[in-house]
Amino acid sequence: MKKIGIFAKVHEEPLEMADQLQKWLVNRDIEVVRRESSPPVLDVTQSNPGHAPADLSCVIVLGGDGTFLSAARWIGNQEIPILGVKFGAVGFLSETRKQDLYPVLESVLKKDFTTQTRTRLLATVREDEKIITTQTVLNDVVINNGTLARLANVNTYVDEEYLTTFRADGLIVATPTGSTAYSLAAGGPILEPQVAAIVLTPICPFTLTNRPLIVTDTSTICMTLAATAMDVTLTFDGQAGLKLNEHHTITIQKAPVPTIMIKVPGQSYFDVLKTKLRWSGGKV
């Protein structure tokens, strides 16, 4: 490996480790590209996150899941492997702990590692047939009501067939990776990362029969808002947002390029799941 990216959360501890890691890599004749996380963007149409250099061998993420999602957004549609190092409180996306980083990196530099692909979603927003933005997400696309105590009526179609109108505080469309994020908090199911599916989870639905729904990842999901919509926002992985109105149409489908995650030997997805959700014997 000749060139590695370091993507760090803007916080004292991750930044200190980024400095140490950069020196460690440079001493091994490896070029380093540094990038730091930035606050969420309120209007995605006015932002340009830039892209990681195409010749990066991998990207090391120092931070929590939010930082990992920012790094995935920076990498974009490039097949650059990501290694997450846990600094946050949950860390579903982090593959190793900070105290284990250097032994893991020794293996990575020797190319002694495996990877796992994670499905992403491609979301296209149109306003009166004009494309406003196209975004790719690793976790989820979320329609969310604002501060006013009003329901968002989300007309939902699957493969051009009308499904229902969700009367709820919002609607989450998540990947299997995103099923352990906002969707889980809203009562959605947990999907193993390799399951070929997309999850639709309503947020606090007014109708009790509006339950989470799992569809195949070959499906195309289309959503519009009722004309009475007020103060409704669309967010992409919690990193960028866009104000919605009844003239917008949101189309979501599986993205052509997945995210590639570096895997640490001896650690399974269910090991991580049990630990994070305290299923390993402790009280929840």
UniProtKB/Swiss-Prot annotation:
Residues involved in NAD(+) binding: 65-66, 139-140, 150, 167, 169, 239
EC class: transferase
Q: Which GO terms describe its molecular function?
A: ATP binding; metal ion binding; NAD binding; NAD+ kinase activity
Task: Report what the protein is called.
Answer: NAD kinase
Would you identify the family this protein belongs to, as annotated?
Belongs to the NAD kinase family.
* Enzyme Commission number(s) of this protein: 2.7.1.23
Location(s), subcellular = Cytoplasm
Q: Which organism is it from?
A: Desulfatibacillum aliphaticivorans
- For the keyword Nuclease, the answer is no
This molecule's function is given as: Involved in the regulation of the intracellular balance of NAD and NADP, and is a key enzyme in the biosynthesis of NADP. Catalyzes specifically the phosphorylation on 2'-hydroxyl of the adenosine moiety of NAD to yield NADP.
The primary site where this protein sits is cytoplasm
Catalytic activity from the UniProt record? NAD(+) + ATP = ADP + NADP(+) + H(+)
Listed cofactors: a divalent metal cation
Q: Which GO terms describe its biological process?
A: NAD metabolic process; NADP biosynthetic process
GO CC terms: cytoplasm
Among InterPro entries, the record links this protein to:
ATP-NAD_kinase_N, ATP-NAD_kinase_PpnK-typ_C, NAD/diacylglycerol_kinase_sf, NADK
* Keyword tags: ATP-binding, Cytoplasm, Kinase, NAD, NADP, Nucleotide-binding, Transferase
Positions of the catalytic residues = 65
